[in-house]
Amino acid sequence: MSSTVIILIVVLLVILVAFYAFAILMRKKTEDRILALEERKESLFDLPVQEEIDSVKKMHLVGQSQTIFREWNQKWLDLSSNSFADLEEHIFEAEQLNDSFHFFRARESVADSEAQIEMMEGDVEGIRQGVAQLVEQEKRNSNKIQESLDLYDNLRSDIADNADLYGTVITELEKHLANIETEFSQFVTLNSTGDPIEAAEVLETAEEHTIALRAITEQIPSFIKTIEKDVPKRLEELQEASDKFIAEDYILPENVNLKERMDDLQHHLEESSSLLEQFELDRVEAELDLIQERVEELYSIFEREYSARRNVEKRSSVLKEYIEHIRVNNKNLLLEIDHVTQAYILSGNEKGYVRGYQEHLESLDADVDEIIANIEAKAIPYSSLSRRVNSVVNSLEDIEKNQIKISETLSGLRDEERAAQEIAERFDSELRTIKRYVEKCNLPGLPKDYLDLFFMTGDRVQNLFKELGRVRINIDTINHLVDVSTEDMHVLKEATTNLTDHAVLAEQLIQYANRYKASNEQVAQGISRALQLFENSRDYDGSFDEISKTLEIVEPGAASRISGVYFKNKPTPDYL
């Protein structure tokens, strides 16, 4: 044979061996999965599901429990009779396919069987859990019934032993106890006839009702005590306080009808008792709170009247004296005004105000007479009288404050006049000092605007003297002239300082600039202009500015240096 044929034979043999090895491997894997399925099937089949179902059957369930059990039982019958046989058939088919080397079909069959058994395992687990819940519910009912009955028995015993604490509510409590007992009987019937689920619901309801009734019984004694003892006692005390209030000649405000309010309180007390018998505890509490609030409101009315009476008795006894005191003050104030007006002109209408106070006093006097008559008649609540008394007192206090204010104003007129006189004399002295100071400067003359300012200020001061010298002084006019004169003097002093400083500096700078006059034509011209402004125009500010600029041309900084030396050594003028 040729080498090519040999190679082909070898390759073919290798392929056959490889395929055989693959087939054996695939068959082995599928076989392992089939064996695992067999084991899972046997384990599932060996579970004691039937025994568990048979034990529940012996419980003879009825009602809702029986319906649930039938559903689980039917599901188990379907599994055991149909699903297991179908699973056996699928596993057998997979074995046949695997043995005949139909690997891919065998794998599909195994996969289907695995999915089927997984679903069956879930179903069996669900059946077992459902059956176990029925059994567990029965056990829970058996355990819980005793606890619930103990709660009920304890509650019934407590109510029976303390019946006197519950008053008329005892009848309603016994009705609720009877209803709970009926629920327990219903539970026993359901549980004994094999319906643990519905029985559990009834037991839960009975226990909830027992706990709720226990909570109610714990609150009732407190409400009973409040309704039957505390509130009646409080109302009795309120009635006694009311009788005492009336006996002591107190009058209630028109909007307070004591009998209606007492009847209303009694009605709310009866309503709270009725609501308690219906176990409307929240509404009972609301009614009792309302009673408490209205009782306190009545007491506050009584207290307000008591307090008002004390105030009326304390203040009304001195009202006449207070009015007379203010009236005397008013009379004296009018005399003082008449005396003051001989020397001063009053511009504040003080006399008109004081006469107005007199009229107001007459009105208040009439009010006081009426108040005293009402007090003696005992026909008006003291709270109303107290407000009127307070109003009169407040009015009298306001009048007295205004009287004092006017009196202080009148007393201060002499001081204001004296102060103005001193200021006028000081200004007159300062004007003379300014005049002498300027004259010492030996200036060729004074600018017109400065002279106008000086003479205007002098006229202001003379006007002030003139007003002060009148027979009757208008202090407002005086004060105005003082203010204006003060401002004028301030302006004049500043103008005097600027004028004299610039005049002296202009002379000093001109003398200093003369050293450059012969050698510098600009300086010569600047000196000429500065002298013209100084001697002819009497413009000392202009002369100072002109010579300062001229010096800056030939010797920068000279004007500033000379000015600095001047201000450093300059003595303070006498007028400052």
Swiss-Prot record:
Entry's transmembrane regions: 8-26
Chain coiled-coil ranges: 105-134, 254-305
UniProt protein name: Septation ring formation regulator EzrA
Localization per Swiss-Prot or TrEMBL: Cell membrane
Entry-linked Pfam families: EzrA
Membrane topology: Single-pass membrane protein
InterPro entries: EzrA
Residue ranges, Extracellular side: 1-7
Main location: membrane
HAMAP family, per the entry: EzrA
Organism: Lactococcus lactis subsp. cremoris (strain SK11)
Family: Belongs to the EzrA family.
Keywords: Cell cycle, Cell division, Cell membrane, Coiled coil, Membrane, Septation, Transmembrane, Transmembrane helix
Function, in words: Negative regulator of FtsZ ring formation; modulates the frequency and position of FtsZ ring formation. Inhibits FtsZ ring formation at polar sites. Interacts either with FtsZ or with one of its binding partners to promote depolymerization.
GO biological process, one term: septin ring assembly
Superkingdom assignment: Bacteria
GO cellular component annotations of the record: plasma membrane; septin ring
Topology Cytoplasmic: residue spans: 27-576
